Curated annotation (Swiss-Prot):
Binding locations of ATP: 32-39, 149-152, 178, 186-189
Organism: Chelativorans sp. (strain BNC1)
Name recorded for this polypeptide: Pantothenate synthetase
EC class name: ligase
Binding site for (R)-pantoate: 63, 155
Family classification: Belongs to the pantothenate synthetase family.
GO cellular component annotations of the record: cytosol
UniProt keywords, alphabetically: ATP-binding, Cytoplasm, Ligase, Nucleotide-binding, Pantothenate biosynthesis
The protein's annotated pathway: Cofactor biosynthesis; (R)-pantothenate biosynthesis; (R)-pantothenate from (R)-pantoate and beta-alanine: step 1/1
Length: 284
């Protein structure tokens, strides 16, 4: 059985209104397509916690600050729909650019604080694009719950902040990062890795897990992070954009483990930018 594909806000809202009349809870999983097991785990979580699940598919041009990255982003709607069908998702909402940003569109949602630093420092305008499209998707779907992966941890904080600040009643549900057997965090960008780079790519997670372990043992942050950065570069990565310890709850920079923390990294390998993060246990 195929998943119904909706293209317009009008169609979407009519379907959701029918569900509401039946007293059904609605979940949404926002994606840019090129679905992998990480996305599908979000869909399964949504199906387990709501009555009707909308998966959105929109490659959002406003969150790309590099035209080449936007052009190279995989677009696989037919394959995505085929992956969703056996799971039982109730709708694939796949608007085009004109539907999402009609002529004259002139509003940007900008979340300060948690959007600054980390990815925000290297991708100017990215989180404005994320915040704008997510705000629209939450308002369009009227979902009770929205499901996001922890792999995009800064994005998760941005989305939580905008729902609080704008009084959007959708509850944001964080789901664990899904990894390949070799540890590499799943990403739609992984398909762009060459065979050699794919072999080396898991060393990013390896360095992250090793660093998190050393921090949990009490090794000073000022010693652990430079060593981890060196290990990533030695593994075949060309650049480490950032490798930082931040507060789990507010993304504030940390110099020690005096509260729940998260280790976050972004690095380039073979022209592909990969991100990852891990929670760090406090020393016993």
């Amino acid at each position: 059985m195929s998943v119904p594909i909706f293209r317009t806000v009008k169609e979407l809202r009519a379907a959701v209104a029918d569900w509401r009349r039946d007293g059904l809870r609605v979940g949404v999983v926002p994606t840019m397509g090129a679905l992998h097991e990480g996305h599908l785990s979000l869909v399964r979580a949504a199906l387990a916690n709501t009555d009707r699940v909308i998966v959105t598919l929109f490659v959002n041009p406003k969150q790309f600050n590099n035209a080449g990255d936007l052009a190279a982003y995989p677009r696989t709607e037919k394959e995505d729909a085929a992956k969703l069908a056996p799971l039982g998702a109730h709708m694939l909402y796949a608007p085009d650019g004109a539907e999402m940003y009609p002529n004259g569109f002139s509003t940007t949602v900008s979340v300060s604080g948690v959007s600054e630093g980390l990815c925000g420092a290297f991708r100017p305008g990215h989180f404005d694009g994320v915040a704008t499209v997510v705000t629209k998707l939450l308002l369009q779907t009227g979902a009770d719950l929205a499901f996001f992966g922890e792999k995009d941890f800064q994005q998760l904080h941005v989305v939580r902040r905008l729902t609080r600040d704008l009084d959007i009643p959708t509850q944001i549900i964080a789901c664990p990062t899904v990894r390949e057997a070799d540890g590499l965090a799943l990403s739609s960008r992984n398909v762009r890795l060459s065979a050699d780079d794919r072999r080396n790519a898991p060393k990013l997670a390896e360095a992250l897990f090793a660093a998190a372990g050393r921090l949990a043992e009490g090794t000073p942050v000022a010693e652990v992070l430079p060593n981890a950065r060196d290990a990533i570069l030695a593994a075949g990565y060309q650049e480490v954009e950032y490798l930082e310890l931040r507060g789990e709850d507010d993304l504030a920079p940390l110099s020690g483990l005096d509260r729940p923390a998260r280790l976050l990294v972004a690095a380039w390998i073979g022209g592909v930018r990969l991100i990852d993060n891990l929670p760090v246990a406090q020393p016993a």
